[in-house]
Regions:
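Ser/Thr-centered, proline-biased regulatory motifs
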Residues: 44-50
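Helix-turn-helix DNA-binding module
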Residues: 52-53, 133
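Short hydrophobic/aromatic patch on the recognition helix
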Residues: 56-66
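Hydrophobic/aromatic-rich alpha-helical bundle segments in the mid-to-C-terminal region
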Residues: 120-125, 136, 140, 158-204
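Short helix-capping/turn signature of helix-turn-helix
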Residues: 66, 125-131
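Alpha-helical structural segments
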Residues: 25-36, 40, 54, 71-94, ...
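N-terminal intrinsically disordered/low-complexity leader segments
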Residues: 1-25
């Protein structure tokens, strides 16, 4: 979510002026800056004071765009959810149901987290410690949606089993645990251990 947010250089002969962001621009800038701050390995809890200082505005200016810091994090969770569900739709639209579809979903979600370390901290809940509990509840609901899709992908994979429903549920649960474990390791290592490390070999062991 990062991009250059600096104003264009001003002509040296004219007095410096501060551009007023267009509607929605400042809101996006706040979310981008918050995401960038979460990408710093070992970063502590982000305060609104630090966020405002990074952007170069007052804390009051932040609250003209968001009612609370929790609402800022909800904006990041919205981005994570839209991105994850969009990636899942890409897979389900192109590939038939089965174990390979489920593994492809895991692969894309891990790649997304690797490219967006700040969002990875949101997905694991690491960035939400000491924040409003509803934020973690929203992330939990997202993980429930992902697990439900994994079950859907695996639905026909155990038709010859004596306990197909249990097998689907257990396999989907193990896959989600693998996903979360990789994300948590990425965060704990200061983003040094990549979620996609030895990915294909690891994924194949999930369906042996």
């Amino acid at each position: 979510m990062s991009e250059d947010l600096h104003d264009d250089p001003q002509d040296s002969d004219s007095p410096p002026t501060r551009k007023r962001p267009r509607p929605g621009e400042r809101r996006l800038q706040i979310l981008q800056t918050l995401a960038n701050m979460l990408e710093q390995p070992g970063s502590e809890r982000v305060t609104t004071a630090a966020l405002a200082a990074r952007i170069g505005v007052s804390e009051a200016a932040l609250y003209r765009h968001f009612a609370s810091k929790a609402q800022m994090f909800e904006g990041l969770i919205d981005f994570v959810e839209q991105s994850c569900m969009g990636l899942i739709r890409q897979v389900t639209d192109r590939e038939a149901e089965g174990p390979q579809q489920a593994l492809r979903i895991l692969s894309l979600l891990l790649q997304f987290a690797e490219k967006n370390p700040g969002m990875c901290r949101v997905m694991t809940g690491d960035a939400l410690v000491h924040e409003h509990e509803r934020l973690q509840q929203r992330v939990n609901l997202l993980m429930d949606k992902i697990e439900a899709q994994l079950r859907q992908s695996l639905r026909g994979a155990f038709e010859g089993s004596a306990t197909p429903t249990v097998d689907v549920q257990v396999t989907a649960s193990v896959m989600l645990a693998f996903l979360m474990g990789r994300l948590q390791r990425h965060v704990r290592s200061g983003f040094a251990r990549k979620p996609t490390e030895h990915l294909q070999d690891s994924l194949m062991r999930l369906i042996r």
